[in-house]
Amino acid sequence: MFITNDIRYIGVNDHQVDLFEGQYVVPNGMSYNSYVIIDEKIAVMDTVDQHFGQEWLANIRTELGERKPDFLVVHHMEPDHSANIDVFMNAYPEATVVSSAKAFGMMKQFFGTDYADRRIVVGEGDTLALGKHTLTFVTAPMVHWPEVIVSYDSCDKVLFSADGFGKFGALDVEEDWACEARRYYIGIVGKYGKQTQALLKKAAGLDIAIICPLHGPVLTENQGYYLGLYDIWSGYKVEREGVVIAYTSIYGNTRKAGELLEQKLLENGCPKVVVNDLARCDMAEAVEDAFRYGKLVLATTTYNGDVFPFMKEFINHLTERSYQNRTVGLMENGTWTPTAAKTMLKMLEGSKNITYCENTVKILSALSDASRAQIEALAKELA
């Protein structure tokens, strides 16, 4: 795939994977991106997942013909990008691997060698001259592993962004970028907003025309749009006004309460309402929704003196990813001693800048006139 006159795509698509990282549903597969810069010296940028090593090597040979790579640049050591380092180094015994000091420590763990006689260790501001192309390296620790670096080619104004600006989905499937990029960012990188913000500040000083991520499409235009969304996501800002109702329901009574709240919110002019049944929806999508919109209602039952397991999992996902700067409403259901609201408050107590609704809904087994009135009041407060 042509990117610029000297930069080509040599990655692969994976339609065999059902759960990315063992947890994220990827109905449209994944891409594992790799690139090659062809100059006086040749640099291959990252490898691919372990199952695609031979396809990837064939892609390299197709682009290079009789020439051989001089460098393998490793931005990130997660196995979906690093699994074929040793395969590459054996295929090209004259090549040198270029990466961060922490990455070489990880190579020792993964492959039993840190390529001490065939390596270049780079850090912040270091450069690698290829000819007319020169790569400048920028450290990006904890976006989202500690060894991560990104690199910038000033000749073609290309940022090789590691997992930054990645998305779910293979490249032979057309779909909206933001939806699956948001789910990818919130799920995988979302905990590290502060570190992502630091990287964005570094990127602001670069003249970026093209972004080459390790997953998803190459971004060749409208860079301000992508950088703006990353600023929203990593800054834990509200992307869109609306209310997310996340509920669990054992016998349908809490579900009915959630549906009534949805109806009342729309009647009161709420611009957008999203409802997620946490037992049946894609949990990662529900988490994505909670970070996308400004308001969240948690509706669940008291269960074994706690909250229903899917709600506990959902809240844990939120707090693990530093959920903050939102308005939260609570709805609890119980037949005796309902305590779910109190438990959810306790689970969220470490979250920053959460505004709790004054109106909390208490359902005693099934909807009543009293709980319907509480739902009406909550809807007016949220809308």
Language-model regions: role of each:
Residues H215-R240:
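Terminal amphipathic helices with adjacent charged low-complexity linkers/tails
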Residues H144, V148, D156, G164-K191, ...:
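Active-site-proximal loop/helix segment associated with metal-binding centers of metalloenzymes
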Residues F2-I60, V150-D153, K157-S161, T254:
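Conserved beta-strand hairpin/beta-sheet module of binuclear metal-dependent hydrolase folds
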Residues K41-A43, F71, H133, K157-F160, ...:
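Structural motif
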Residues F2-N5, S99-V148, Y192-A198:
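Metallo-beta-lactamase
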